[in-house]
Amino acid sequence: MSKVAPHLLIVDDDKELCSLLSKFLSRHGYRVSVAHNGSEMASILEASRVNLVILDLMLPGEDGLVLCRRLRATSTLPIIMLTAISDETDRIIGLEMGAD
């Protein structure tokens, strides 16, 4: 019986970063899907079983904190917040919104 690779969802509007992360994680045995905004994230989550979401803080439209709060309201899916900002306040807010 073969083991199914964990499925990760990267949500980030930076296509170059998504490509880099996707290639790296795929080489390490993960299945990876990519969304560039909240709408794409919702579509992927509805269509597939995902084991972990890697969510950017700064997205066009709804930001990562809003998406994290919405996801946390209906799911216990692990969420890792990803950001280029190193502001302690944003980290605290992310944890309060339910990021892991």
Predicted segment positions?
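N-terminal/domain-start alpha-helical segments
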Residues: M1-D100
